[in-house]
Amino acid sequence: MNILTCEGVTKVYGSGDNRVTALAGIDLKVDRGEFVAIIGASGSGKSTLLHILGCVDKPTGGRVTVEGTDLAGLKLTQAAIFRRRKVGLVYQFYNLIPTLTVKRNILMPLTLDKRKPDEAYFEEVVKSLGLAGRLEALPNQLSGGQQQRVAIARSLIYRPALLLADE
């Protein structure tokens, strides 16, 4: 079963002389458990595609479905909830909240959903990412690699159907 399907996805910015086509007719199918890497030159549309696949932005044309849900049909609030529950996003810049501890940053998606964490799974995630001893640290007390691992843990903590990582 396809967990992700892209059909003819296009993204255009601007109009007239300022029109820029970032994506043109992208077709992609990804099965559950499959690993796919999108590579290309700087400015080739990789991050734009990631934002569309992650329900952060909408395509100008075409269709994207995740687990059978057509992302274009989601209103802003629905998209935010869908993204939080179904799509793990790890950005090139970690987007950690500087005033929250590592633990609270990791648990943020569950907190927003008013869900209790599965403590055993939480321990498994932080241990596997080497963060067990840093849970009370603030992001500015971590190395860049540790901050990236916190962002990965935050994306994994709610067991998303799809994990997307930008660089």
Predicted regions and their residues:
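ABC family nucleotide-binding domain
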Residues: 2-167
